[in-house]
């Protein structure tokens, strides 16, 4: 039987068949192209490719380019001022960033940049388009107008000229000091000159007078000086007075010293007594060897080196004064201890008795009406139909609201920018015209018996406003907001977030409520902007 010979490769060299590398038969064994390689025959190495490389110490490291940085072992985007990362790790522009400014006709509201357009321009599917008017009929020109090559011209004589596109007579020019005012030519004169009876004359300067201590003699002015002053080398200087010293002071050269007698001495440039008088102590002071103590009687005691009043049960020291210790049901008022009374109790003839309950609080509701028109604007365009009601019951205000988009906001996509609807109120609780949901829409009080809107203001409207002491700084409530939930039967990925911001004041407003819609990237696809009914509560304002 003939043995089959294995086929040789096409590039086999029978003279020198040693070109192809042979796998190492010595450990360690490895599988090429799976993280390990043989950097030189018999040497095991890690198989890496860019952006991986080796450091000077032989460790594997990651090479980073512009815009990337390694921080605490993690690869991050190297972002500068005005940029930040959101919860999804996306790079976004900071909300309060001042990195970009916009000038008219560009305007920025919230996170949206818009372009104001005037006549002759329109927005067609996001593209700015020019509306060209119909061409006018051809014009005919008669003298002195002439038309040549599509240009209309007006021949001018020597005395005529065109200035800034206006036809006029060439004016006569005048050089200073001559000037033309209205239809007159006048002469401008400076200090020392005047025009009198149509003639130019010089004005004589007034005579100079001098008051003491200045003195004029012939053509010179001098200064009179008194005691303590003198003029030396043309300068005014003070001359020292002749001072005399009486005992115990005496003057030696330029030094003044004090003479001391018995019982006094000068130590460290200070006058001190050299002997101590004998001290005697009267009651309640007692001298014991070199110590002086205070004898305290009833009601007094020495504590911590201080004389204090000894207090019994029911009394204590508070901020250096004696105060009574009171328990539950008592309070201090007008320097007297009184009973602390709750609801339904009062004091009559020195005794506590129950009182009849007060009549219940009548709720107040402010609203837009049951079926409002498109009453909220974004970028100056009415596009949101907003139903909002504020109901004050007891100390809390309940907010019920729902919103439906119209026009360009009839549906929203995951890339929709955040936007806000703002209600601004004055100090009386009346809706102002400065928000994008303002007093130009239907707004007022709801009667108990029907669904109308009473627009006549009332002093009770203030009760529906956020309490300014409770919300002295802006406060917010964030809640999930489903979109078109009934049509989609509560399907997932059909909700965004709505934030109610309380008293984020601006301008002349006293109270504000801001409905801010955000996190549209939670949507899976384009969705009709028709929110579920949103409910919030906050503490109401005092009457």
Swiss-Prot record:
Repeat listed as a keyword: no
Entry's induction text: Expressed in the late phase of the viral replicative cycle.
InterPro entries in alphabetical order: Adeno_fibre (IPR000931), Adeno_fibre_knob (IPR000978), Adenobir_fibre_prot_rpt/shaft (IPR000939), Adenovirus_pIV-like_att (IPR008982), Attachment_protein_shaft_sf (IPR009013)
Annotated region described as Disordered, given as residue ranges: 1-36
Domain notes: The tail region anchors the fiber to penton base capsomers, whereas the shaft, built from several repeated motifs, allows the knob to protrude from the virion.
Subunit-level organization: Homotrimer. Interacts (via N-terminal tail region) with pentons.
A Pfam family of this chain: Adeno_knob
Alphabetically ordered keywords of this record: Capsid protein, Host nucleus, Host-virus interaction, Late protein, Viral attachment to host adhesion receptor, Viral attachment to host cell, Virion, Virus entry into host cell
Source organism: Canine adenovirus serotype 1 (strain Glaxo)
Record's subcellular location: Virion; Host nucleus
Family: Belongs to the adenoviridae fiber family.
Keyword Transcription regulation annotated: no
One Gene Ontology CC term in the entry: host cell nucleus
Further comment: All late proteins expressed from the major late promoter are produced by alternative splicing and alternative polyadenylation of the same gene giving rise to non-overlapping ORFs. A leader sequence is present in the N-terminus of all these mRNAs and is recognized by the viral shutoff protein to provide expression although conventional translation via ribosome scanning from the cap has been shut off in the host cell.
Protein name, as recorded: Fiber protein
Described function: Forms spikes that protrude from each vertex of the icosahedral capsid. Interacts with host receptor to provide virion initial attachment to target cell. Fiber proteins are shed during virus entry, when virus is still at the cell surface.
GO biological process: adhesion receptor-mediated virion attachment to host cell; cell adhesion; symbiont entry into host cell
